[in-house]
Amino acid sequence: MLFRSYAYLLKTRCLSKEVVDWFVKKKLIYETRRYHNVVFIGRDSFGTARFASMRGTVDNYGNPFKGDVENNDKTYGFNVRNKKNKEVKVFEAAIDLMSYMDYKRDGQSNKLALGSTWDGALDRFLLENPQIKRISLYLDNDKAGRKAAALIRKKYIEMGYHVKVRFPPYGKDWNEFLVAERKKAVIQYLNRNSNLDRKQAIG
């Protein structure tokens, strides 16, 4: 069971249950039995697991556990594939990929989380998906992310791809943006109900 992973992804990361259910059903995330870490699986074009990264479900003093499973192939990343789609959207972290998919309700495009700012997983993904012609970079809006986006954009434009860079509207990354948007929506909802209660009391 994924009780702690669900609690972490829904409450801390503000992802919808619908999206988390989708990734669980696709066997792209699971929970370790011993420490209850959430595990993100990267599969190849045949569906074979090639990569797995772990994230602690409890933030101890602001320093959550992060790590890769032993014998990982880092040229694979956490991904969503659609052979009929000609674009891949690239993120640094798995949770950012999930956050974007949740916020935009985007279940159609190819999506890939590099696990860092290194583009080795993108090279592999493009090799396995020759139909892709467009790359959209959704890396973090920080110094490292902006630098990586510029370098990756230049490299793949020279290889003949159409490349765009798209940072979140605000915040450092797509999960930070999603969390802020969801909390803002809750506050607006509570304020509307509070105003309605006042009007009814006055009436």
Residue ranges and their predicted role:
Residues T12-C14, R43, Y103, F177:
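Generic structural signal for bulky hydrophobic/aromatic residues embedded
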Residues L28-R33, G62, D173-L178:
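Short, solvent-exposed polar/charged micro-motifs at secondary-structure junctions
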Residues R33-E128:
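Phosphate-handling DNA/RNA-contact segment within nucleic-acid enzymes
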